[in-house]
Amino acid sequence: MKYDIIGDIHGCFQEFQNLTEKLGYNWSSGLPIHPEQRKLAFVGDITDRGPHSLRMIEIVWELVIHKKEAYYAPGNHCNKLYRFFLGRNVTIAHGLETTVAEYEALPSHKQNIIKEKFITLYEQSPLYHILDEKKVIVCHAGIRQDYIGRRDKKVQTFVLYGDITGEKHADGSPVRRDWAQEYKGQAWIVYGHTPVKEPRFVNQTVNIDTGAVFGGKLTGLRYPEMETISVPSSLPFVAEKFRPIS
């Protein structure tokens, strides 16, 4: 099986459509379908900050749950939106406010449909996907080789948030260790979460979050070809979001 793994979309539907078309997908059915049966995989954070988060929920639900034509691994923004939909007490900030505003603008019956679709998508998707006979792992913020196969709380924190130190940057965002430099596993780890200006290959890992929602690019990785394809963002460039990885 061949896959096209898509970086953090964050509600940037137009960029997603442009990227999938560039990757050879046909949208005539209203969904991206590849003529050679390639499958899409998502590294999570499909919502928040961008203009079309609910549209992305609809599309990913349709592809993953209804048609079973794609793979989705949740990100930290997905986890927070899931908790919001469950009625938990979450802070509506750091991007969630844009998704909530879209949601609250809907009539109540449409709110219920979106809520149920996202809850189903989240609950029926694994923390990470092990694909192609364990040769590639699709996850949100990465995974250490000794964590592969585990799904306990410690691993969940790592996969959703990265290798956080407990310290904070001046803007409140967490300081993260560069776990990819220490990775010695054989499987390719394809992930996102931390915006980089260009896809970042380190050992057998590749970060494909090229900051679409911050005015960078939306990137897909063609697997097993290991070729990256990007399209430019239509949003303003926010330089401080592309912090050097420590």
UniProtKB/Swiss-Prot annotation:
InterPro entries: Ap4A_hydrolase, Bis(5'-nucleosyl)-tetraP_PrpE, Calcineurin-like_PHP_ApaH, Metallo-depent_PP-like, MPP_PrpE-like
The keyword Hydrolase is annotated on this UniProt entry: yes
Coiled coil ranges: none
Residues that span the membrane, as ranges: none
Superkingdom of this protein's organism: Bacteria
Catalytic activity: P(1),P(4)-bis(5'-guanosyl) tetraphosphate + H2O = GMP + GTP + 2 H(+)
Keyword Ligase in annotation: no
Family assignment from sequence similarity: Belongs to the PrpE family.
Protein name in UniProt: Bis(5'-nucleosyl)-tetraphosphatase PrpE [asymmetrical]
Species of the source: Bacillus cereus (strain G9842)
